[in-house]
Amino acid sequence: MNGATPSSAAAPAPVPDWRQFCELHAQVAAVDFAHKFCRFLRDNPTYDTPDAGTSFSRHFAANFLAVFSEEVRRVLGSAADTMEPEPAVTSVTSALKTATYGHSRSSEDVSAHAATKARVRKGFSLRNMSLCVVDGVRDLWHRRSSPEPDGGATPKAAEPASEPRDKWTRRLRLARTLAAKVELVDIQREGALRFMVADDAASGPGGTAQWQKCRLLLRRAVAGERFRLEFFVPPKASRPKVSIPLSAIIEVRTTMPLEMPEKDNTFVLKVENGAEYILETIDSLQKHSWVADIQGCVDPGDSEEDTGLSCARGGCLASRVASCSCELLTDADMPRPPETTTAVGAVVTAPHGRARDTVGESLAHVPLETFLQTLESSGGVSENNNPGDEGAELDTDAEAELELSDYPWFHGTLSRVKAAQLVLAGGPRSHGLFVIRQSETRPGECVLTFNFQGKAKHLRLSLNGHGQCHVQHLWFQSVFDMLRHFHTHPIPLESGGSADITLRSYVRAQGPPPDPGPAPNTAAPVPACWTEPAGQHYFSSLATATCPPASPSNGAGASSSSGSSSSATSLPPRPAEGPLSAHSRSNSTEHLLDAASGATEEPTEATLGRARAVENQYSFY
């Protein structure tokens, strides 16, 4: 009776084709590997060669055989002591092997081989990524064991072998879920930097700073957040070590020389929880570019509909990203009434404070050609070296010294970071957009900041006593000749080679240009220096203005009064600075503070005889 049961059960049971089984799983593995192979070539185009498919498939097949053999050996070794062959499995596999190979084996050998094939099939299915095929194989085993009289024992025997598969599939689903969560939607910027936590300097050996290499990623997150800043340590790590939402950043600024005396290209991030990160870039351009990008993502101004609200928010952000300019803070503390500037075809309303320098505000971009045409139609710029008496020369120099701040492309003591933000507002589309500002580090010099293919470049300008402009190895008779030249000829970059960068347009300084009127020596006396009229240009206070004499005098009187050192209201000689140069930030700060207190003290000897410290080499910095 016991011997007849297996034979009667084996007759109706369908015998699966092992070749079809192998072909099915081979197709699944091949399709999965082909998809991943194509994705790999898209991510790494250097491997995209005509024979890449052959090389990859051969390597895949060789490794597949090695891993397959090892996995079979491992599964058989772990399951040999726990699993015993069932009579039904023995009979079915015996019929399968007899029909396939035609060998005559004993029932014990066939049962052992059937258990091996069962484990091999399960082990092979675990290597595939398709869960539907795994479920299909499971249904196949259930159908084979269903005709057995004691079929309740067969599923129990198959459970220990299916548990590892279920655990593996659960891990596979979990890994896919995590990968979907960390998928990036919009990467703003990515680069390799070095960073340290501010507290690590004291905790390191001997109080030294603990710098770490990282991959800094500025991205937009998935779940409705705006932006995040992530530190990947080491740079090749797949998950960030530190992840900071930009809404938690309260301050972004470049470091001062006293803070990091041994490092030049560093900036600071301060977070709401009190953490402070110091990051180091390769050069100064990357430093200011990172600061500008982070600030732009912290509070993008284009999301504000109300201009007044945008200006107010920009004022808060300007205090966060304050540069090392002491004049910036002093001037920001002085309240100024808002003014409305009406230009040709454009109306811009903004307060006079430094909050206008934020990227979010809509600043007018004026074509340089329009300015040059206006300049030519007005007869050009008056020469400063006309013959005349000394008093007339001094008055002409004083008038010319105010001219640079009167032009719309000059932004006074605008910081390097804010200048970069202005020219980078349109990204690569604003190629050729420029501003001219006063140098933060070299008194008496100016800097041409322009947009070069979406990156901010800073070119130093030097103005001599005759108004001539020196840019790298080129000399120009005036700043206007320099603008006219670089409007039609490419700017020679320090990196060499041909660069298609010409000055196309400029960011117009927000402030009404002064109305043409009498020269400063014929203006009505004002009570103190640096007290400007209501309609004066915003940046005119950044140039050097002198107090008019107490009583009107002619040119000779002006000459004699300029030679007298006892008069506090006389015009001080400035042999070391040109008529078109802008003065240092520290000097202008002193005058601002004096104006606030209402004092009119005599200029010190150091102020009168300030000389240029270094003969400049004109390059990007």
UniProtKB/Swiss-Prot annotation:
Main location: cytoplasm
SUPFAM superfamilies recorded: PH domain-like, Phenylalanine zipper, SH2 domain
Compartments (UniProt record): Cytoplasm; Cell membrane
Region (Disordered): 143-166, 507-528, 549-611
Domain SH2: 409-507
CDD domains reported for this sequence: PH_SH2B_family, SH2_SH2B2
InterPro entries found in the cross-reference section: PH-like_dom_sf (IPR011993), PH_domain (IPR001849), Phe_ZIP (IPR015012), Phe_ZIP_sf (IPR036290), SH2 (IPR000980), SH2_dom_sf (IPR036860), SH2B (IPR030523), SH2B2_SH2 (IPR035058)
Stretch forming the signal peptide: none
GO CC terms: actin filament; cytoplasm; cytosol; plasma membrane; ruffle; stress fiber
Tissue: Strongly expressed in brain; also expressed in spleen, kidney and skeletal muscle, and at low levels in small intestine and bone marrow. Strongly expressed in B-cell lines, but not T-cell lines. Also expressed in myeloid and fibroblast cell lines.
Biased composition (Low complexity): 552-571
List of residues that carry Phosphoserine: 130, 303, 597
Phosphoprotein in keyword set: yes
Post-translational modification: Tyrosine phosphorylated by JAK2, KIT and other kinases activated by B-cell receptor in response to stimulation with cytokines, IL3, IL5, PDGF, IGF1, IGF2, CSF2/GM-CSF and cross-linking of the B-cell receptor complex.
Gene Ontology MF term list: SH2 domain binding; signaling adaptor activity; transmembrane receptor protein tyrosine kinase adaptor activity
Modified residues (Phosphotyrosine): 47, 618
Keywords on record: Cell membrane, Cytoplasm, Membrane, Phosphoprotein, SH2 domain
Gene3D superfamilies: 6.10.140.110, Pleckstrin-homology domain (PH domain)/Phosphotyrosine-binding domain (PTB), SH2 domain
Domain PH: 186-299
Keyword Cytoplasm: yes
Function per UniProt: Adapter protein for several members of the tyrosine kinase receptor family. Involved in multiple signaling pathways. May be involved in coupling from immunoreceptor to Ras signaling. Acts as a negative regulator of cytokine signaling in collaboration with CBL. Binds to EPOR and suppresses EPO-induced STAT5 activation, possibly through a masking effect on STAT5 docking sites in EPOR. Suppresses PDGF-induced mitogenesis. May induce cytoskeletal reorganization via interaction with VAV3.
Subunit structure: Homodimer. Interacts with KIT/c-KIT, SHC1, EPOR, PDGFR, VAV1 and VAV3. Interacts (via N-terminal region) with SHC1. Interacts (via the phosphorylated C-terminus) with GRB2. Interacts (via its SH2 domain) with EPOR, INSR and KIT. Interacts with GRB2 after B-cell antigen receptor stimulation. Interacts (via PH domain) with VAV3. Interacts with NTRK1, NTRK2 and NTRK3 (phosphorylated); after stimulation of the receptor by its extracellular ligand and subsequent autophosphorylation of the receptor. Binds INSR, GRB2, ASB6 and CAP. Insulin stimulation leads to dissociation of CAP.
Protein name per its UniProtKB record: SH2B adapter protein 2
